[in-house]
């Protein structure tokens, strides 16, 4: 027997797609009640207007949930501590998807809904990220993905549907790019960007100045970390949200944090994207420098070997997984002594190290110096080298010089 769905919680963005989903869901599920869930991730939009639009589109309720601080502390700071970059380039701004799914589920359970819905298309990664998280958090909820089932196939058809249902459609040219924005990044896809042979146009960037338009003087920033987490900027302790906003502004005006990449989507295709993440780029650089000072060689190398695994987990939306929990436990141990201060210069798209110190620094000048010292006995190296190279020596003897061609 088909399950009767009377109430649906919809992850709502305010765009054309999720706006027409409200009447569509009510039509296709016997006039079910639709509750819109809007997450404030620092996307710098008029969220009150978006809430009103949801209600005008037919939602019975619309929640606006401020998750900026939670996003920073529970998602972005673990990401910084991990040092993970997807395919060594992508700063993983879509880490917001599991958080959106989490809030959607929380409200769904509070409102006792039968199902949840999202606006991700059937060609992208987000459908996987949302649905993986929902199934992990509330497997009893039914998931509705209209883009995979409805007959609307184009923007023009969506506009016709919207007008037929009294949904306001702004009379403006279609944006040339598809964008996603939160406090961590802005992504740009589509339009001319779909062709990797074409240079990025000047009109793409919103948060970052083109290098040709950056100041001719460098700017110094100082970041303090405690157990791998950024806590202060230029000597001033700031909330996570304020720190990110301030650093985005400072680094953005110097043209820092722009990535033009072709990435492998989870669903099998390659896609080109432009990503702006000024604060993220600076934080990653500073954190990496501090780790080089505070972690042992074996710990640092093991952590680096796991970074792509962590990046894959985030990219694929497997935030709520046992594997991710286990990796977090390891990373947290590595960060116990990643405390200190890093000084950087920002100039013409470059992040230049300008000094760092930590009470837990493993760098000892008396050992590393090229001058005469009374600490390191260079004769000790001979025995180490003999043992370290013993297997190579034996192999060469057995194989009469070895064959390494």
Curated annotation (Swiss-Prot):
Keyword field: Amino-acid biosynthesis, Arginine biosynthesis, ATP-binding, Cytoplasm, Ligase, Nucleotide-binding
The main enzyme category here is ligase
* Nucleotide-binding keyword on record: yes
> Which one of the record's GO molecular function terms can you name?
argininosuccinate synthase activity
Annotated binding of L-aspartate, by residue: 121, 125-126
| Pathways per UniProt | Amino-acid biosynthesis; L-arginine biosynthesis; L-arginine from L-ornithine and carbamoyl phosphate: step 2/3
**Sorted alphabetically, which InterPro entries does this protein's record hold?**
Arginosuc_syn_C, Arginosuc_syn_N, Arginosuc_synth, Arginosuc_synth_CS, Arginosuc_synth_type_1_subfam, AS_cat/multimer_dom_body, Rossmann-like_a/b/a_fold
Q: Which GO terms describe its cellular component?
A: cytoplasm
Where is L-citrulline annotated to bind? 90, 125, 129, 178, 187, 263, 275
Q: Domain of life, per the record? A: Bacteria
Q: Name one GO biological process term.
A: argininosuccinate metabolic process
Q: Where does ATP bind?
A: 11-19, 119
Chief location bin: cytoplasm
* Reaction(s) catalysed (UniProt annotation): L-citrulline + L-aspartate + ATP = 2-(N(omega)-L-arginino)succinate + AMP + diphosphate + H(+)
Q: What Enzyme Commission number(s) appear in the record?
A: 6.3.4.5
* Alphabetized Pfam families for the sequence: Arginosuc_syn_C, Arginosuc_synth
Q: What are the subcellular locations of this protein?
A: Cytoplasm
Q: Which family does it belong to?
A: Belongs to the argininosuccinate synthase family. Type 1 subfamily.
* Description of how the protein assembles with itself and partners: Homotetramer.
Protein known as: Argininosuccinate synthase
Give the originating organism: Legionella pneumophila subsp. pneumophila (strain Philadelphia 1 / ATCC 33152 / DSM 7513)
Gene it is expressed from = argG
